[in-house]
A protein has these predicted regions:
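Conserved acidic segment of CheY-like receiver
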Residues: 2-12, 18-22, 48
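C-terminal output helix
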Residues: 101-110
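His-Asp phosphorelay/catalytic-motif detector in bacterial-type signaling
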Residues: 68-76
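Short, structured coil segments at secondary-structure junctions
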Residues: 25, 71, 90-93
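Alpha4 helix (beta4-alpha4-beta5 surface) of REC/receiver domains from two-component response regulators
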Residues: 79-97
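Conserved phosphotransfer microenvironments
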Residues: 15, 36, 45-68, 81
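Short hydrophobic/Thr-rich beta-strand motif most characteristic of the beta2 strand and flanking loop
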Residues: 26-36
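The C-terminal output helix
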Residues: 111-116
Length: 116
């Protein structure tokens, strides 16, 4: 099985687009709308992709990043607005892609992080 990339994304259409991009990069995507614990995922995770966004009500999906253990897999954050970019930096994501222009770097970024 190719390395598993966990996608934390609550919007189905965004999740589907990320899944397609990750599959095209020869990784196995697993998508969850929110994450309580990495132990909930039945496979070893090589990297995490999360869209940082403040939309809707309740806790945003990206809030799960703050609750991860110290030894968590590398996190690639995708953000559009300045406040979202700042939030990704606050969460100490290993890579922050500024959408839409940095999205083309997702494949290259995952390959570098995962090492395949």
């Amino acid at each position: 099985m190719p390395p598993v990339v966990l996608i934390i994304e609550s919007r189905k259409e965004v999740a589907a687009a990320l899944e397609a991009a990750i599959e095209a990069s020869n990784f196995t995507p697993i998508t969850v709308p929110y994450l309580e614990s990495l132990a909930d995922i039945p496979h070893p995770i090589a990297a995490i992709v999360v869209r940082v966004a403040f939309e809707g009500v309740g806790e945003p999906a990206h809030a799960a990043i703050a609750k991860l253990p110290r030894n968590h897999p590398p996190v690639v954050a995708i953000a559009w607005e300045e406040n979202e970019l700042a939030e990704a930096r606050r969460l100490k994501c290993e890579v922050v892609l500024h959408a839409p222009h940095d999205i083309t770097r997702l494949r290259e970024t995952l390959t570098k992080l995962v090492g395949t």
